[in-house]
Amino acid sequence: MNNFSIISEYKPAGDQPKAIDEIIAGLSSKKRSQMLLGITGSGKTFTMANIIERTNRPTLIMAHNKTLAAQIYSEMKSLFPKNAVEYFVSYYDYYQPEAYIARTDTFIEKDSSINEQIDLMRHAATRSLLERRDVIVVSSVSCIYGLGSPDLYYQMMVNLEPGQSYPRDQLLNDLINLQYERNDIGFERGCFRVKGDNIDIFPSHYSDKAWRLSFFGNELEYIHEFDPLTGEKLAKLDKAMVFGNSHFVMPQETVNNAISGIEEELQKRLEFLKSQDKPLETQRLNQRTQYDLEMLTETGSCKGVENYSRFFTGRNAGEPPPTLFEYLPEDALLFVDESHVSVPQIRAMYNGDRARKKVLVEHGFRLPSALDNRPLKFEEWDKFRPQTVFVSATPGPFELEETGGTVVELIIRPTGLLDPECIIKPATNQVEDLISEIQTTIAQGFRVLVTTLTKKMAEDLTAYLQELKYKTSYLHSNVHTLERIEILRDLRQGTIDVLVGINLLREGLDIPECGLVAILDADKEGFLRSEVSLIQTIGRAARNSAGRVILYADKMTKSIDKAVSETLRRRQIQQEYNEKHGIIPKTINRAIHALAEFEKIDSKLDKKQAHTLFDNPAKLKTHIDKLKKEMLKAASNLEFEQAVKLRDQLKTLEEAALELS
């Protein structure tokens, strides 16, 4: 068994050694939950890595979105080059779930686009968890959604070893049952081919390696790993384990049992709908389900097969579905990053999913068992999670309750940077005072971030500052990803001096050039001016050694008092540490990366407009990718009509892209 081994020129410093020791002591004493309070720039990921190395336990790290998960995955991959670091997020580039809008009698079919690379990485993650112990899986919160049963996944695995006998027809049949396709011409991931005494398999978890099985009669003589593009032999293997090309593979007996269960539920549901005098729903459900049953009988699968997952996994109604958590060993370790965001997300996912599916069941589009194809309820996740370390600069109520309010702190930054100075000024005449502060900050060569309470206020303030000839821009939720990057680049370069926003902490801004963060109407209690929001916003000025924060308030609220007191407490600890060790804080100098050319155009295009506005396929693809992100956002917000409109626009643009290419 391989042990975890960090490869890095850095060693734990500042608060890190103490924090690592405290967390490990808590794990050793069987504490189920611990809280690692790490401020921005304190080295939380490096601290997590050292805890993993010291405990030597398989680990799952949950992040609240794909972007953050990818960041952590990249860092862990560089720290643990000799161990299995895997990435497990939703493999959909675009996902429009089935939905029914009763008020317009509109049924929207499921539509999705699967990212092959992410699907490969998901297979690599589950395979690693079943094959070895030195595994780190970095996942988004989507890991609480249903996945194929690990028992069936492992049970159907084909174990190959040289010297063993494998009847040829049986082996080929086993590969087909694993949902591998025979393709003797086009050899790609998830396929196998037969040439004489050789069988080549392209495993589902590889993109650039395949296996060649060399037989003498029924005896397997050799297993060679080779490059599927060049045919070059890369290694000779002692064994090979072939897992399913899908996480939902199952033996024929399981399929037959599932069909019987579906038929039984269908009859009960049809009787119920008839008793409710719902002929349309009765006919619709019978027609749709009978078609699915025919497909299952003939092919072993059907469109939307996941809606029958309860029958395939042998679970009872209401029982939790199998998820990635069932692939983890009993002694696994869990980190929940940015837990103040991740935990509420986990809590909300079940209700959103059930609300949509309940409508489908009520109107005869699905059987009630479709409700069991779902994410875990929060209580189920809480029950299944192994020993857990929550990680956040601003812990939420659940984490604090679970840990009894005890936190392990990471306050000292390796750079020596201090938390910013906080100044409270009256909200009366706040705009006039802000203008004076903007002048002073710009004269020092720094930038300014201003956060307001409403969109109208942000728009008016931006327009007013522009009238006064200040280079000002406005960042809001309708700004698309590439435009947002462009605005931030302009801010860092000095093309923009002032950036106004409503919820800047959500935007995740890290601007080393920011010398001032101004929080208008800081005394208006609510989500945008809560203790957590204020601390996160104050942190935007922590990348600059001269960073300041001004909170405009006519009264001292509990949130302001707690946020400012906490910032001052951290600042004093950091100052004392720097004085003791002779550290001089220095602003972080990060390179400003150039953006590719970006076309700002209206999203409502026809083919002719697409040809006119995009003079090459690359530019058109950029816009198509942007629309896909908008579709994903609309679908996740349950805005199904908008998602369908965007999907129709995409089809037109994709036809144009095909012609352009």
Curated annotation (Swiss-Prot):
* Keyword DNA damage appears in the UniProt entry: yes
User: Where in the numbering of this chain does the Helicase ATP-binding domain appear?
Assistant: 25-414
Can you tell me which residues bind ATP? Answer: 38-45
Pfam families reported in the protein's UniProt record: Helicase_C, ResIII, UVR, UvrB, UvrB_inter
Using the record's annotation, list all stretches that form the Helicase C-terminal domain. 430-592
For whether the record's keyword set contains Translocase, the answer is no
Q: Main localisation, per the record?
A: cytoplasm
What molecular functions are annotated in GO for this chain? ATP binding; ATP hydrolysis activity; DNA binding; excinuclease ABC activity
Please give the InterPro entries that the UniProt record associates with this protein: Helicase/UvrB_N, Helicase_ATP-bd, Helicase_C-like, P-loop_NTPase, UVR_dom, UVR_dom_sf, UvrB, UvrB_inter
Per its database record, what is this protein's job? The UvrABC repair system catalyzes the recognition and processing of DNA lesions. A damage recognition complex composed of 2 UvrA and 2 UvrB subunits scans DNA for abnormalities. Upon binding of the UvrA(2)B(2) complex to a putative damaged site, the DNA wraps around one UvrB monomer. DNA wrap is dependent on ATP binding by UvrB and probably causes local melting of the DNA helix, facilitating insertion of UvrB beta-hairpin between the DNA strands. Then UvrB probes one DNA strand for the presence of a lesion.
Kindly state the subunit structure of this protein. Forms a heterotetramer with UvrA during the search for lesions. Interacts with UvrC in an incision complex.
Domain remark from Swiss-Prot or TrEMBL: The beta-hairpin motif is involved in DNA binding.
Q: Which family does it belong to?
A: Belongs to the UvrB family.
Q: What is this protein called?
A: UvrABC system protein B
Q: Which organism is it from?
A: Rickettsia conorii (strain ATCC VR-613 / Malish 7)
The gene designation is uvrB
